[in-house]
């Protein structure tokens, strides 16, 4: 008999019900729970799957390049980046006939196309690509990398090439190689590309392999490097009237500290970016030589941690035992990696609009909105995942003996204080913020807007002033024309920074008022509540006062049977599940705030945001309703327009979102009864009863139904907002 799915669990494979399929899918990636798994095979499988992941990423990015080269308008866009709309790819079969064909034929294309809102055109242009041939070359290169990654993944599953467990647990060597190799060498290589290809490209020189050695990136060549006259590389930067991509107004500097933005492209100076990557490369190349491996020099991480015991004994045994705890737990390592990556992704969202690195991307408003929202949602999912794996670590990998009285054990010992403080912060933020919004809402409703409680964010304004923003009149630090820092800044470091902070044509240090103060605290409420749920889930994962033996039930369990009250909905998985709703809710507020403030800035009517954002009806009426009007009008008696597809997606997103509640609110008994009724009717109906299931149909478990509900809620929520965001922005600004 052929092996039934799932092959990794014989117990499940023999299950006579549809549970087999659902539990099989749910545990497919939980390698630790598979039959015949060993620590060695676990590490090897994960290692090999990383190569598969890389192969998919390279294939996907190769596809982006290939489709733009084949069906896009990159060469036309390069001629006029501000007025030509970049094409992502063609649409094969636009539905709804000729009106659809006409609506979607744009950007100078001959047929219907999708417009790119990903920023790839600006990125490729900035790094020196100019022709479709360049894009094809990049696509082929990435396809080759993808193939190599696949082969490497397969190779490392062959007996001869399987690394040993000791190799995986050699933390010092891995850190050295990742710091020096991944970050150091790749940053140095990127600096090389910027200096040799991108910067000459921005000055009208087309550098490729055939002329790479013939064109000096700097007139002096390597002379200043070897003679220690490094300042020569910063002299004669591009002038303020430099036209990007041409020699007009171009300088010769390659590594600068100008600060601020290129006046024409409104993006960071390429020579500043090259300098930044060179500095990063230097730091990480040094960092990659810090840890002790074969040569007996450098630090041993274990020794560092063992020695790291705070004086006075106030933190117990400090970091003793942590090295082995972390090094032997994949979940702990994954939790740390996800936490770091989540924070970095959110920082990317922030910096891509406030300090745009790619030429002309700041003037492509829809792309700016899409990239900000995209990176914030990604960050939210990654950060919640960090806590999920932290909780799994406590259940599966934590050893109380090994961690006696160290900082980790002490976190568990005083978890009540941590959880109650977070709870207090969340309650305080929630009641006060909502109280202010509701008060203001009532005042507007009663026709007395002057009775609103409007609080100026003076501390935040003071911080902005300290960094050089003069409009508030604080006259402090960098905003004080008499301070030594201000005077040094004019000449020594970042002379363009202070100009950029005080120009109104960018998103650096936007002017803030009472509306910003309120929404800031609403977001703080969301962040603290999400964190409360996640932290409580992880710290209570092993047990709580109500259920001291919780760890024996695993990561996700619905209840401990009907006979034990209070054990439902308190697994670590349930905490993750609840936190994701709060995470989505919080990022909703973040993106609403970002988008509305920027729409009014771009349209030149910032007073709309300032006046309407201080009360709830303002957000509902002047942001959500006003900006969804075009979506609600996507199909009308006059035919269709280029926003129709977003209007459809807006409706479809709501449908998917609402479907989530079918799984989230109705419980298992209802479904089991319904399924049995349907199966009974099916078996007694002629023709229909010729078809039999191999598996007896049963309802999803409570935990699985929650997962399916959460997935629909999340996907529908994001789909709906994506359509709203792109349509409302592109409808206004093209």
From Swiss-Prot:
This protein's record includes keyword rRNA-binding: no
Binding site for chlorophyll a B1: 654
Molecular functions (GO terms): 4 iron, 4 sulfur cluster binding; chlorophyll binding; electron transfer activity; magnesium ion binding; oxidoreductase activity
Transmembrane segments: 46-69, 135-158, 175-199, 273-291, 330-353, 369-395, 417-439, 517-535, 575-596, 643-665, 707-727
Protein's cellular compartments: Plastid, Chloroplast thylakoid membrane
Topological category with respect to the lipid bilayer: Multi-pass membrane protein
Cofactor note: P700 is a chlorophyll a/chlorophyll a' dimer, A0 is one or more chlorophyll a, A1 is one or both phylloquinones and FX is a shared 4Fe-4S iron-sulfur center.
Role noted for this protein: PsaA and PsaB bind P700, the primary electron donor of photosystem I (PSI), as well as the electron acceptors A0, A1 and FX. PSI is a plastocyanin-ferredoxin oxidoreductase, converting photonic excitation into a charge separation, which transfers an electron from the donor P700 chlorophyll pair to the spectroscopically characterized acceptors A0, A1, FX, FA and FB in turn. Oxidized P700 is reduced on the lumenal side of the thylakoid membrane by plastocyanin.
Name listed for the protein in its UniProt record: Photosystem I P700 chlorophyll a apoprotein A2
Taxonomic path: Eukaryota, Viridiplantae, Streptophyta, Embryophyta, Tracheophyta
């Amino acid at each position: 008999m052929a092996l039934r799915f799932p092959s990794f669990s014989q117990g499940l494979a023999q299950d006579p019900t549809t549970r087999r399929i659902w539990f099989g899918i749910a545990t497919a990636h939980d390698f630790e729970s598979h039959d015949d798994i060993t620590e060695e095979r676990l590490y090897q499988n994960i290692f090999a799957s990383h190569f598969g992941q890389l192969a998919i990423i390279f294939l996907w990015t190769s596809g982006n390049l290939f489709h733009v080269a084949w069906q896009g308008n990159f060469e036309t866009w390069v001629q006029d980046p501000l007025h030509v709309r970049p094409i992502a790819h063609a649409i094969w079969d636009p539905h709804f006939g000729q009106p659809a064909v006409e609506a979607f034929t744009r950007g100078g294309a001959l047929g219907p196309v999708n417009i790119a809102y990903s920023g790839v055109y600006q990125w490729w242009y900035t790094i020196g690509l100019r022709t479709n041939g360049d894009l094809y070359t990049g696509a082929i290169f990435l396809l080759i990398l993808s193939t190599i990654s696949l082969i490497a993944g397969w190779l490392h599953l062959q007996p001869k090439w399987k690394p040993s467990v000791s190799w995986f647990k050699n933390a010092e060597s891995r850190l050295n190689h990742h710091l020096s190799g991944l970050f150091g060498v790749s940053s140095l290589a990127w600096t090389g590309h910027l200096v040799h290809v991108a910067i000459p490209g921005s000055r009208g020189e087309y550098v490729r392999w055939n002329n790479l050695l013939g064109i000096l990136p700097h007139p002096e060549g390597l002379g200043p490097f070897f003679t220690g006259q490094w300042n020569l590389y910063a002299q004669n930067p591009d002038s303020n009237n430099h036209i990007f991509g041409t020699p007009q107004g171009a300088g010769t500097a390659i590594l600068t500290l100008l600060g601020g933005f290129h006046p024409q492209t409104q993006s960071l100076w390429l020579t500043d970016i090259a300098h930044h990557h060179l500095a990063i490369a230097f730091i990480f190349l040094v960092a990659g030589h810090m840890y002790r491996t074969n040569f007996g020099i450098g630090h041993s991480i274990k020794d560092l941690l063992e020695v790291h015991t705070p004086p006075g004994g106030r933190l117990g045994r400090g970091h003793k035992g942590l090295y082995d705890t972390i090094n032997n737990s994949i979940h702990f390592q994954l939790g740390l990696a996800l936490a770091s990556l989540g924070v970095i992704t959110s920082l990317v969202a922030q910096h891509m609009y406030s300090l745009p690195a790619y030429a002309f991307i700041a003037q492509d408003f829809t792309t700016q909105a899409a990239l900000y929202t995209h990176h914030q949602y990604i960050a939210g999912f990654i950060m919640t995942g960090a806590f999920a794996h932290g909780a799994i670590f406590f259940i599966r990998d934590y050893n109380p003996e090994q961690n006696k009285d160290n900082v980790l054990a002490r976190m568990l010992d005083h978890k009540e204080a941590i959880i109650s403080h977070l709870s207090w912060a969340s309650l305080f933020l929630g009641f006060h913020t909502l109280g202010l919004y509701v008060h203001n809402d009532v005042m507007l409703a009663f026709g007395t807007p002057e009775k609103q409680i409007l609080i100026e964010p003076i501390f935040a304004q003071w911080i902005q002033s300290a960094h050089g923003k003069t409009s508030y009149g604080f006259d402090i630090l960098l905003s004080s024309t008499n301070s030594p820092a201000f005077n040094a800044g004019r000449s020594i470091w970042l002379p363009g920074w202070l100009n950029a902070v005080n120009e109104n044509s960018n998103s650096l240090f936007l002017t803030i008022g009472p509306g910003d103060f309120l929404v800031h605290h609403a977001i703080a409420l969301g962040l603290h509540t999400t964190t409360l749920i996640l932290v409580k889930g992880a710290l209570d994962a092993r047990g709580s006062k109500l259920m001291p033996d919780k760890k024996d039930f695993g990561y996700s369990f619905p209840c401990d049977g009907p006979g034990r009250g209070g054990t439902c909905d308190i697994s670590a998985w349930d905490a993750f599940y609840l936190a994701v709703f709060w995470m989505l809710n919080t990022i909703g507020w973040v993106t609403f705030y970002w988008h509305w403030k920027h729409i009014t800035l771009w349209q030149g009517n910032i007073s709309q945001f300032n006046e309407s954002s201080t009360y709830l009806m303002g957000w509902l009426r002047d942001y959500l309703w006003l900006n969804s009007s075009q979506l609600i009008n996507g199909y009308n008696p006059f035919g269709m327009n280029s926003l129709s597809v977003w209007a459809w997606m807006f409706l479809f997103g709501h449908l998917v979102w609402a479907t989530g509640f079918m799984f989230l609110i109705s419980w298992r008994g209802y479904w089991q009864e319904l399924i049995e009724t349907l199966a009974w009717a099916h078996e007694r109906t002629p023709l229909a009863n010729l078809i039999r299931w191999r598996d007896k149909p049963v309802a999803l478990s409570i935990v699985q139904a929650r997962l399916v509900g959460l997935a629909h809620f999340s996907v529908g929520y994001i789909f709906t907002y994506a359509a709203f965001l792109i349509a409302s922005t592109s409808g206004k600004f093209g």
